[in-house]
């Protein structure tokens, strides 16, 4: 393959991965999944009923791995056995995967809310009806973009793994990145905006999540809107960089061209990792110097 064509394919893969990362994080925000959902689950038990979609089907890595694997398996069957257009096969597989994901989401939130009836937590059917299509939409975008990445890597770049295996791996990866990157914006900031920023969360405030929005009661749409400003784009950039840089190394230094090129790809990968570690350390040090530790108010110090 010509180097320019390979770089063009990598650019397309990077764009698709960035979109997939952003939509994955926003899907977990609107449906409340992964780590922050522990506070949503705890809220009714602390006498704080809410209108937050409480699905948390599983951790994001296995949830997205299942979703992407289903879409890839269906697309593979349609392409290989029925000679269907790859684009149609990827779209159809993504629709089925999003439908399965929505089914799990509805049963999960209804089961969780029903189990908390003793704590006066209602089941808001209007909330479920309004949130489920949005969850399906985000799930479709995530699955479709991951399938595009996997298909291009398999067919164009000649990756040895089959489409379903690649989709499974990227599903785990995108779920892990969304859980560790974007969910921090939702769980550490959006859920507890009534407490002063930087003060941390006292154990006595566990479950005391924000339940009232700018107008009316807060729901998943409010959380998704807020996290689309930072958490979603950050997750998209993180996943896009992971996919692009991981494939860029072996495209520039193709191990198939010889042992020396293989070692050059390893060295390039190590250098990139070291640069990212140092960059992250610099950002953390700068943030600590700029904002410092949390300081108590003078009134609090006087009363103490």
Swiss-Prot record:
Recorded GO CC terms: cytoplasm; plasma membrane; vesicle membrane
GO biological process entries: methanogenesis, from carbon dioxide; methylation; one-carbon metabolic process
Record field: transmembrane: 3-23, 77-97, 133-153, 155-175, 233-253, 259-279
Reaction(s) this enzyme catalyzes, per UniProt: 5-methyl-5,6,7,8-tetrahydromethanopterin + coenzyme M + 2 Na(+)(in) = 5,6,7,8-tetrahydromethanopterin + methyl-coenzyme M + 2 Na(+)(out)
Top-level lineage group: Archaea
Entry membrane topology: Multi-pass membrane protein
Class of enzymatic activity (EC top level): translocase
Keywords, ordered alphabetically: Cell membrane, Membrane, Methanogenesis, Methyltransferase, One-carbon metabolism, Transferase, Translocase, Transmembrane, Transmembrane helix
Disulfide bridge partners, by residue number: none
Entry annotated with the keyword Transferase: yes
Quaternary structure and partners: The complex is composed of 8 subunits; MtrA, MtrB, MtrC, MtrD, MtrE, MtrF, MtrG and MtrH.
Main function: Part of a complex that catalyzes the formation of methyl-coenzyme M and tetrahydromethanopterin from coenzyme M and methyl-tetrahydromethanopterin. This is an energy-conserving, sodium-ion translocating step.
Protein name per the record: Tetrahydromethanopterin S-methyltransferase subunit E
Annotated source species: Methanosarcina mazei (strain ATCC BAA-159 / DSM 3647 / Goe1 / Go1 / JCM 11833 / OCM 88)
